[in-house]
């Protein structure tokens, strides 16, 4: 297993400067991470530099609250892909899920899936820290029904990040063929490997260098 190729090297802080984003890009190239995960305004900047590498460009949609309209999320995804994104991590409408508006949630995801079809992978952030286990299961089922490629635990901006028990539950729900991304709170190789053992196929972290070099990092 190549741990570096399971990492989305992440910088999503609102105050991230060009220099900070550049550092993430440079580290991703040096360590051959799977992707950089950056805010949409940096997609073209990253895409130009990573075009001739194995590092993908991942961005976020409806982030971090998930409360945009479906139309805006679909447009945001299309715009990001036009700018060079290979993967889009969208946030579900958490309030709609909790209101049991399941058709709305499914259609919200479907709009992004349709915008990305044939062009980019779609990961669905369900924000596990805000959900009951039953809601986590339902969110994963809706993401799978809508044709998403991955389910993802967290934005890193809520009350908690990835937990091994949540990864296990998500993997059990979506089955063996869909991706599961653990994001938020993974700081070292031991934590990353625990997530992978539980069923994660991707790790989202700002601490990618620490994870692959055996250190413990601070951050998302």
UniProtKB/Swiss-Prot annotation:
Its GO CC terms?
cytoplasm
- Which residues are responsible for catalysis? 89, 152, 181
Question: Do you know which Gene3D superfamilies this protein is assigned to?
Answer: Aldolase class I
Where is this gene product found? Cytoplasm
User: Reaction catalysed?
Assistant: 2-deoxy-D-ribose 5-phosphate = D-glyceraldehyde 3-phosphate + acetaldehyde
Task: Enumerate the Pfam families for this protein.
Answer: DeoC (PF01791)
Keyword Cytoplasm applies: yes
Supply one GO molecular-function term: deoxyribose-phosphate aldolase activity
Task: List the EC numbers from the record.
Answer: 4.1.2.4
Q: Which residues form the signal peptide?
A: none
Q: Which UniProt keywords apply?
A: Cytoplasm, Lyase, Schiff base
Q: Which family does it belong to?
A: Belongs to the DeoC/FbaB aldolase family. DeoC type 1 subfamily.
What is the role of this chain? Catalyzes a reversible aldol reaction between acetaldehyde and D-glyceraldehyde 3-phosphate to generate 2-deoxy-D-ribose 5-phosphate.
Q: What is this protein called?
A: Deoxyribose-phosphate aldolase
User: Which organism does this record belong to?
Assistant: Enterococcus faecalis (strain ATCC 700802 / V583)
Q: What is the lineage of its organism?
A: Bacteria, Bacillati, Bacillota, Bacilli, Lactobacillales
